[in-house]
């Protein structure tokens, strides 16, 4: 397993991290012992970063992790989260997570799912989430305060420049990399560790392997290899979180972490060029369309619409709700001025896609 330094923390983190929200159900419940076997095996194979959160797997993930931690023989680090804005509620959630996982401290505690700058400011108010986490750190209950976000690259840059955090977790993959690249670079420049989630686009990339076959290089056996390598080869990225819901997935993902050959800057630029040239129907997140006179966040709608093109219409509304906290009815504000379409580098039919999203919202939620 390859290891990278997590920012300035001094910790060496496995390039593949264990994402703890893909455990399989056995009927209507989770077999804690069976799921824990995946976690233990990953640790045996060198994974030392384990990411979980309240609510993952119907709120069972932290319990599964606890089952695994007591059986693991190699050192490991734990990442969990709270999305509470209220300081007292965050403290309660932190103590619950510690108790559930039988831990004295959380290594990486996330101010979780910052949606936009207004949301960020709400976490930073006096007596709020961040200040409470800082006090818990002083007490030794938290080792490193980090954040997770679905913000734009510009917004991420603003957050990291406030110098309040030691690391971040951010969605980053071949579908959205232009949307977040600036934030990634800003975090690296500031010395933050970076974990990336959704490296496989929430499963879309392997499900549509034929569509994305163009990203494979000469040494890549599969599209999944190429997608994981794309993330892990960025110097700015410390660890790539991969959900592992079977022993086969554990073995596969760890093999990628064992055999990773870093891509140099020229090769990464080549891949990025192929992505832009090949995804002619998909929004690449360049954000040239952002100057809507009605303040519609067009790029976020178009990135969400990518899910429909790839066969997952429900994914539009999952993204809007959980990634950005946007209501689908905002598209009704469109006055069809065409400014966004004139700015679009992909020449996408943005207006008609906004109308489709409005129509889909009658069926999907």
Sequence positions of predicted segments:
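Conserved residues at the C-terminal ends of beta-strands
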Residues: 19, 53, 109-112, 148, ...
